[in-house]
Amino acid sequence: MPLPKVEMTIFETILARRSVRRYKARKVDRTTVSILLEAAVHAPTAIHQEPWAFVVIQDKVLLRSLSDQAKPLFVAEAQEKGLEHAGHSFDIFKYPDFNIFYDATTLILICGRTSAPSYSADCWLAAENLMLAACAMGLGSCVVGSALPALNTPKTKVLLNIPENFITVAPIIVGYPDDEIVPVMRKNPVILANIPATQHG
């Protein structure tokens, strides 16, 4: 597969990536999606299981329908876990016009085969590869964890052709940012221990 030419180094891409929640209406073409998936499957994987599979959704009506299904399920799950009492507010999820996918034109689901011992970790490594590739290509991305309760219902899995032995691990929206992407500052690494080599080690 011909790969796009990018100007950023890998470290510049890591520092530039951030979650994007405002998108242009411009669609992401299928070739670009294929490149993102190619980046994803080159992630590290435990004992070479490669337990991932993907669903690509670009249908606006379906995306809105999934958003509407996800909002009440996510709020119910958050309340059950007591997240509102932990200082989180979920009022925006109660607004009919709020789209949890932020009107992005593309949603990519990274699904994991649950029989693989490290399927969740592997899928998240694939997710980071995908998001870094998107950033390097001038695209924005964002993990939409609030969609998970809806995406993993039996009804939705049948609709999206997700087998019973797979679950959605990382729902990622992708699109062209409607704003300038400004890198965010992060805290310095918390080093719990720094054990130098001994004289004989």
Predicted regions and their residues:
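Short proline/glycine-enriched turn/loop segments at secondary-structure junctions
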Residues: 157-163, 180-183
